[in-house]
Structures are given as C-alpha cells and as structure tokens.
C-alpha cells in the first residue's frame, strides 16, 4: 500500500505542476504582450486596444474581473479590481481627442457594474469638456 501512495503522490504532483504551468501560460504576461510603440497602438483596432489595456493592467497588479461584451456594455469595456477597489474602465483608441460622452458613459457604468471608480484610457487626448 505504501508504494501505491507514493505513486499517487507523484501523480498528484505532476498534475498540479502541469496545471500551474498552464495557469501561468494563460494568466502571465509575456513582455511582447505589452511592449508596443505608440505607432503600433495607434494602428490597433478597438478590440485589440482593449485586450492590450487589459494585459498592461494585469501586468501592473490589477485583477481582470470581466471583459464586457462588444455591444451593450453600459459604457465599460473592462472591469478590474485593485487593492479592494472595483473599477470600470472605458477604452478609447481614437484618432481624435476623446469627448465628454465617453466620460459620462463610464461614470454611468460604475453603477451598473457596482464599481467605486471609473477610468477612461485612451491613446489620444481629451477634449476640454471631457477634462472638466
């Protein structure tokens, strides 16, 4: 019976090791995932920018709780938590400055997603109205 326990222990160790490797592969960032030039970011699609933003956030200690659906997202693309704070994030990869509408949308998304904070992340600038 002792031999069977050793074999079972080794089998459990191997399965746990394989699971950890898989989990690291899925969750861990590779430097190339977030190592982009501004020109490369400007060429991304909106969805690519959302995924890139999520990768950068994850690499900086944020927990990605949800990537919202492409339409009907109530004004948030990513829901994250950081140090016990839940945050709604609106990603805007624009060629022009981001207007006040994006800010209003993500603020309204805070309530829908039960968040304490809201952020708009962009590759551009904000209009004066959006900054106020």
List each model region and its residues.
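Mixed-charge (Asp/Glu-Lys/Arg
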Residues: 1-132
